[in-house]
Amino acid sequence: MKADALWYEAASVVGITNALNVVADGLPADVLPPLEASAAGAEARAVLDDVRATYGEIPAPFLTLARDPGYLADLWGAVRRAFEDHELSRRLKEALAFAVSLTSRSRFGTALHLGQMRRLGVGPGGVMEITGVTQMFSSYTKIADTLQLEPDMGDIAPVDPSPAPGGPAGGA
């Protein structure tokens, strides 16, 4: 399992990014308006304070979920765990979440994770590189899906144990 730790960590970021995007894009403000942070109960405000400390703001989905402090706390706990530095850095995870959001056409997620990448020092060149790689892989995936291709790289592309970009410098 240790050899796959990076993949599990990345998969967690992908899943949690999707979950947050579903709330944000599926419950827009005209359907279920976000609360003002000051209108939330004490339990929800404590969570929202932690969200603000992490993001520098409180993204709308967290304010929407403030109506249900338990749900808010559960989702925030999952987001926080997924995006903390572990084997992969938060900066790399924000780039991955940006790519996931861009590919799934989540306006909320694309804006949130682009803003976080910028906060964490990713410049215009880095943003364009991530966008280009995302576009390329998304295009190839659509072509492969359309042609119903099966993966055939198992015997010629062995597992690479080296750390992913943003991972620990000395290897795992």
Regions found by a protein language model. Name each.
Residues 1-172:
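Hydrophobic alpha-helical segments
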